[in-house]
Swiss-Prot record:
Its EC number is 6.1.1.15. Signal peptide: none annotated. It catalyses: tRNA(Pro) + L-proline + ATP = L-prolyl-tRNA(Pro) + AMP + diphosphate. This is Proline--tRNA ligase. Its main location: cytoplasm. Homodimer.
Length: 569
């Protein structure tokens, strides 16, 4: 019997000092989780019950899709990461350590290498493909600034799956199947989500989609088309090419014009009395690579902003940081007057929307001078990249309708890895012609422990969590308002047994606490329904409270079971 007096759920009156998001505040105060270190959390019985429900939904849908569950070691030999080339690329988030024999290991944030090692030299023929293996296990990422509770912690529970294929077409089919599977998982959890185009990050590969749950406290900006199904993370969003009806500047090609102290796009547009659309902005960054760093210049339209993830991908850097004035001077770059005409010994890239643009204004690489009448033509195609940040109000690349910006929290990510890892680790099979080929791989991750926090972010009020019936640790709480009322206690015990026998998850609050304390805990913990057994029993009435909206309803005892079967079961 699940009695509150025997159930370990230590609630707190005050939120942790560093808690700013509702999920962090309520999950900690309600006794779902407990922080034991920076980015490290224990799951208490309430949290574990929700976590198990999330895991079961994920497992059921993955099994239904034909994937097979395995359980890999939390620790991976560093040699596998060195073999794939990710050992240095991943950065400081990858926790590296040595055992007493000086052997190097990592705590796995993902398991591409370990899973590939599992099938290498065992899956040897196309006849054994496709194969999809997954696990639900702990991961570790040494975040520089763990924050937001379970949303950005260092140790987390994740479902990561990896598929192996004989060709790209078969990988594409599995990618679409996982798209449907992840959508079904999130639909079953009752979450409002969007699958969006995304950047592949350190994992790499080609096709990539993120699953974002919409939430006002989301850490990611996403662009959603108001007309079609296009949606994308701002890091990967595309738009229909912009146009401008304002008059272009007119001048001979690359005429040099004296522009004293005109260092910003706004002052440049004002000086020439033109729209900033017809200017070219230079953004200088220091690109960090494995064994070196160097300055890179990105040229974009003056009316746009640089999207740094796109810029980082364009130059294949591990990281981009701002360049100092001293570094600009040393490279011979004049801040506020940089252009690509005559630019020497510096890598540069141009946003692809500028290709073939004419009569533009750009820096002359000389203090207090700009070039007007610039035509962006006859340049190496490799210099043109997608560099700009798409914003709300821009037009959809698919249908041309307006894009709307929303906040989202990433809960899942699916990738087409292609042959990146299999080539690096020499993992091959024999195709239909007996020829050795690298596997085509897919990678599919979903944040299991993160979903607990995301569900809270998506559904709460000022009093606490609001769980739906699918994820709630208990669907119904029976609250005895006065333990000295023996008739009420007897009725509550009998009701508990009857509802439990019907398969309902019920918690009986039999604590010797004031009624107000019990109600506060119900509102904080967020079970979907509560039944209050109290004075109304004298009139054969029980109060049913729906947590969402705190809607109260008096029900006659002889109608109670029928109403509960309709509303709660």
């Amino acid at each position: 019997m699940m009695r509150f007096t025997k159930f370990y759920a230590p609630s707190l009156k005050e939120a942790p000092k560093d808690a700013s998001l509702p999920s962090h505040i309520f999950l900690t105060r309600a006794g779902f989780v407990e922080q034991i270190g920076s980015g490290l959390y224990n799951f208490l019985p309430l949290g574990k019950r929700v976590l198990d429900k999330i895991k079961n939904i994920v497992k059921e849908e993955m099994d239904k899709a034909g994937a097979q569950e395995v359980n890999l070691s939390f620790i991976t030999p560093a040699s596998l990461w060195q073999e794939s080339g990710r050992y240095n690329v991943f950065g400081k988030e990858l926790l590296r350590f040595k055992d007493r024999k000086e052997n190097e290991f990592v705590l796995g944030p993902t398991h591409e290498e370990a899973m590939l090692s599992l099938v290498k030299n065992k899956i040897t023929s196309y006849k054994q493909l496709p194969l999809h293996l997954y696990q639900i296990g702990l991961k570790f990422r040494d975040e520089a600034r763990p924050r937001f509770g379970l949303l950005r912690c260092r140790e987390f529970l994740m479902k990561d799956g990896y598929s192996f294929h004989a060709n790209e077409e078969d990988l594409g089919r599995e990618f679409e199947l996982m798209y449907k599977t992840y959508s079904q998982i999130l639909q079953r959890m009752g979450l409002d989500f969007r699958a969006v185009e995304a950047d592949s990050g350190a994992i790499g590969g080609s096709g990539s989609k993120e699953f974002m749950v919409l939430a006002k406290n989301g850490e990611d900006d996403i662009l959603i088309c108001e007309n079609c199904d296009y949606a994308a993370n701002v890091e990967a969003a595309k738009r229909a090419k912009k146009t401008c009806q304002d008059e272009r500047p007119e001048a001979n090609y690359a005429s040099k014009f004296h522009t004293p102290n005109i260092k910003t796009i706004d002052s440049l547009a004002q000086f020439f009395k033109i729209n900033a659309f017809y200017t070219i902005k230079a953004v200088v960054k220091k690109a960090i690579y494995e064994n070196e760093s160097k300055l890179v210049v990105f040229f974009i339209r003056g009316s746009d902003d640089l999207q740094e993830v796109k810029a980082q991908n364009a130059c294949s850097a591990l990281e981009l940081v701002d360049a100092s004035e001293e570094e600009l001077e040393k490279a011979g770059l004049v801040a506020g007057f940089i252009g690509f005409v005559g630019l020497k010994d510096i890598d540069f890239y141009i946003d692809f929307e500028l290709e073939n643009e004419k009569q533009m204004i750009m820096g002359a690489n000389e203090k207090d001078y700009h070039l007007i009448g610039i035509d962006v033509v006859n340049l190496n195609k490799d210099r043109f990249k997608d560099l700009i940040e798409v914003k709300e109000g821009d037009c959809c690349v698919k249908c041309g309708a307006k894009l709307k910006q929303s906040k989202g929290i990433e809960v899942g990510h699916i990738f087409k890895l292609g042959q990146k890892y299999s080539k690096a680790m020499n993992a091959n099979f024999l195709d239909e012609n007996g020829k050795s080929q690298p596997f085509y791989m897919g990678c599919y991750g979903i944040g299991v422990s993160r979903l607990l926090a995301v569900a809270t972010e998506a559904s709460h009020d000022e009093k606490g969590c609001i769980w739906n019936k699918t994820l709630a640790p208990f669907v119904l709480e029976i609250i005895v308002s006065n333990l000295k009322d023996e008739k009420a206690l007897e009725f509550a015990n009998k009701l508990y047994e009857d509802l439990t026998n019907l398969g309902l998850e019920v918690l009986l609050d039999d604590r010797n606490e004031r009624f107000g304390v019990k109600m506060n805990d119900f509102e904080l913990m967020g079970f979907p329904y509560a039944l209050v057994v109290g004075k109304g029993l004298e009139k054969n009435e029980i109060e049913l409270i729906q947590r969402e909206g705190l809607i109260k309803e008096l029900i006659k005892t002889d109608e109670l079971m029928e109403i509960l079967k309709k509303k709660v079961l």
